Amino acid sequence: MATSDINSVVIVGRLTRDAELRYLNSGTAVASISIAVNRSKKDGDQWVSEANFFDVSYFGKGAEGIKPYLTKGTQIAVQGSLRQDRWEKDGQKFSRVNILADSVELLGSR
C-alpha cells in the first residue's frame, strides 16, 4: 500500500514588515506576509537565539479582513502548506519556498 504525501505546516512568529495586499486579475485578494521565527540553538555552553524568515501568501476574503491588523511586530500563527515557486530569468533558474496559508490567527502585538 502506498503512503500519501503530507504537506502541512504550522508556524508562529512576528511580522517583519506590514503585510501588503494586492488583487489578482480574478479579483481575489492576496496578502503577502513576511514573518520571523526565533529558534534556540546551543553554541558551546550557551543557548543563543537565531531568527528564520518565511514568506507567507494568504488568499481570499480572510486576507482582506485581517490585513489592517498585520503590522510589523505583530505575532501571528499560520497554518497552511509549502509551495515551491520556480522561474527562469535571463537564462538563470531560481526557486523559493513559500507558505500558502489556510488560516492566519492574531496572537498579539509587540
Protein language model regions, located:
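Single-stranded nucleic acid-binding surfaces, predominantly the OB-fold ssDNA-binding core
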Residues: M1-R110
